[in-house]
Amino acid sequence: DLFALAAYLKEHAHQFYNNIDVTSFLLDVDAGWTFHSSIPIGYGAGSSGAYSAAIYKRYSVEKDNDLEHIKSDLAVIESYFHGNSSGLDPLVSYSDSAFQIVDGIPHRKEIEPEMSALFSLKDTRIPRHGAPYISLFKSKMENKELSNKIKTTLNPAVHNAINAMLIADKDELRKEFFKIRYFQL
């Protein structure tokens, strides 16, 4: 409901570094504005991030280019869909760039095209929403045994996969992806 989103943006206006022109947003909604994306909506694959980025790109008034401020603003918008957000997914969509977070600060990273080509989204046509899975994950993290396995097995594999991606090491990336897939079984 775009009208509910507009009300949310107005209610949270004090949280933005860059103001959001809610009036123009409402006028466009009244005029039939819609969102089109190649990311399937409602599958938990990043559509809320793309949607948040599109709103921000079109309706943010001041253009403070500080990445941390933009990420924070985008987190406020995406929180409408999930209850909370790091802002990273919409930042990736907004800037059409990859980022590495170092000490909580986003740093833009170039990814070699042949590395990006290793990934694709498959539309299963099975709608899903990310929020219930996020809640389930948080509740399962209360299990100390699982939490420890994630910290000692999954997290290192994810970090190693990211590093392999950044240095364009396909063999290492495949090896780490195998570890990630195996962990999920």
Language-model features, listed with the residues they occupy:
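Glycine/serine-rich anion-binding loops at beta->alpha junctions
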Residues: 36-58
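C-terminal nucleotide
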Residues: 1-21, 25-30, 36-37, 41, ...
